[in-house]
Every structure is written in structure tokens, then in C-alpha cells.
UniProtKB/Swiss-Prot annotation:
Cofactor(s) in the UniProt record: Fe(2+)
Record-linked Pfam families: Pep_deformylase
Known function: Removes the formyl group from the N-terminal Met of newly synthesized proteins. Requires at least a dipeptide for an efficient rate of reaction. N-terminal L-methionine is a prerequisite for activity but the enzyme has broad specificity at other positions.
The organism of origin for this protein: Vibrio vulnificus (strain CMCP6)
Molecular function via GO: metal ion binding; peptide deformylase activity
Name this polypeptide is given: Peptide deformylase 1
């Protein structure tokens, strides 16, 4: 397994709409394993393939406290949304930024697991929010897209400043 590079906003590759996985192969399973390792290495609770410049419909999530219960969703599709919720979200592709995003409180999602078996999942609370956040990535959408243009610009400017600082430190 290997750690993949996470793209950061405003990288245009984050806007790419992911294509469905045609067949779960050993290559796809390696991508899944690398994504899980990357998610843990970056201390995230979710990661979409788009974030690591792989434009296929693959998501990994682990909201467990023990950080050893990874969930794999290949070709995920939300079948139903219920209620309203929202928490202050962050994102590995938008480091250091957080914002309140309106989301459904509960979702029903259909997907394939790491072995290509179809399953349906009823999710609520943090898991429901995380699923919606990661599936947005597969559509080329980021949580900052829910913000006002001014807030989005402030975040973009802050990230550019951090990037310039880091480049000077090298």
C-alpha cells in the first residue's frame, strides 16, 4: 500500500466528475487500499478518489473512534434523503478551513463493497453527512461551493498564502 497525494483547492482536477467503476478488479482494490492508507495518514474520516486524482466513483470512510473500521463505497448512489442537519465540515482538500454546510440528516445509499458485492446502507448523523460530503467530490463539488463567494475567496486566499509560505521554507 502507498500514501497518495491529496489535491488541494483550487486545483481544477477536483472539479472532474468521476466515472463509474466498470468492474472491481485487483487494480481497483489496490486503489481502495491506497485510499484507506492515505485517509488514515492524513487523519481524515473520508476520502473520495477524485481527491487523489483518480476520477472513478470510489469513496472510503472511517468515522470509528478506533480508526480501524474502513467502509468502502464503489459506485455509490444516494437513493433517499430525509430530514435536515448540518455540522461544521472540514476537508482534506481544503486544509485548515471549516464551514457549516446544510445536509440531509439521514440517507439511504446503494454501493458496491471492496469485493464488488452490492449493499444498501441506512446512515444518519456523522456518517450520513460524511457520505454526502464524499459523494459531492465525485460530482466535482466541494463543501466551499455551499459558501458565499466572499467566504470561498477568503479560503482560497488563505490556502494560497500557506502554499507560498511552505514553498519558501523548502
Amino acid at each position: 500500500m502507498s500514501v497518495l497525494q491529496v489535491l488541494t483547492f483550487p486545483d481544477d482536477r477536483l472539479r472532474t466528475v468521476a466515472k463509474p467503476v466498470e468492474k472491481v478488479t485487483p487494480e481497483i482494490q489496490k486503489i481502495v487500499d491506497d485510499m484507506i492508507e492515505t485517509m488514515y495518514d492524513e487523519e481524515g474520516i473520508g476520502l473520495a478518489a477524485t481527491q487523489v486524482d483518480i476520477h472513478q466513483r470510489i469513496v472510503v470512510i472511517d468515522i470509528s473512534e478506533s480508526r480501524n473500521e474502513p467502509m468502502v463505497l464503489i459506485n455509490p448512489e444516494i437513493l433517499e434523503k430525509r430530514g435536515e442537519d448540518g455540522i461544521e465540515e472540514g476537508c482534506l482538500s481544503v486544509p485548515g478551513a471549516r464551514a457549516l454546510v446544510p445536509r440531509a440528516a439521514e440517507v439511504t445509499v446503494k454501493a458496491l463493497d471492496r469485493d464488488g458485492h452490492e449493499f444498501t446502507l441506512e446512515a444518519d448523523d456523522l456518517l450520513a453527512i460524511c457520505i454526502q460530503h464524499e459523494l459531492d467530490h465525485l460530482q466535482g463539488k466541494l463543501f466551499v461551493d455551499y459558501l458565499s463567494p466572499l467566504k470561498r475567496k477568503r479560503i482560497q486566499d488563505k490556502l494560497a498564502k500557506i502554499k507560498r509560505f511552505n514553498e519558501k521554507q523548502r
